[in-house]
Amino acid sequence: MKFEKLVPSVFYTNLKDSFKLFTDCLEFAIGHDETSAENAFCVMEKDGLSMLLFQNKEYAEKVYPEFRLVTKDIEAVYKKVSATHPELLHPNLNKVTLRPWGAKEFAIKDEQVCFIIQEWP
């Protein structure tokens, strides 16, 4: 078997609430826009990564996913995020921290999703 990419889905009560985290903070772009459709959704894209974001109150209330984004320069990412969007820093991991498993990590979140930013040695 060969796969090209994994494209996860995240559900929001109000899809526009996702834009602060995805477009403003993480600098994803909307690759496909159906935000005005009856069953609103969009595809966020950046650096070969894609995520489907859906407006669905029922699923948004049931699911709170966590993802990891791996970088080679966590200090630069942290510096930018903490300067521009400090309110998105996760209270349990709001500084770059060396974890017992060897990765440096910090986390950001909104009301619907959490991203752990990682750098491996």
Name every feature range the model reports, one short phrase each.
Residues 1-19, 67, 121:
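N-terminal beta-strand motif that seeds the catalytic metal site of vicinal oxygen chelate
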Residues 51-54, 107, 115-118:
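Conserved beta-strand in the GNAT
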Residues 56, 93-99, 119-121:
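Acetyl-CoA-dependent GNAT
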Residues 10-50:
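Core segments of cupin and vicinal oxygen chelate
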Residues 47-51, 58-60, 74-77:
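Short, charged/polar surface micro-motifs in flexible loops or helix N-caps
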Residues 1-4, 59-64, 100:
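Short glycine-enriched loop/turn motifs at secondary-structure junctions
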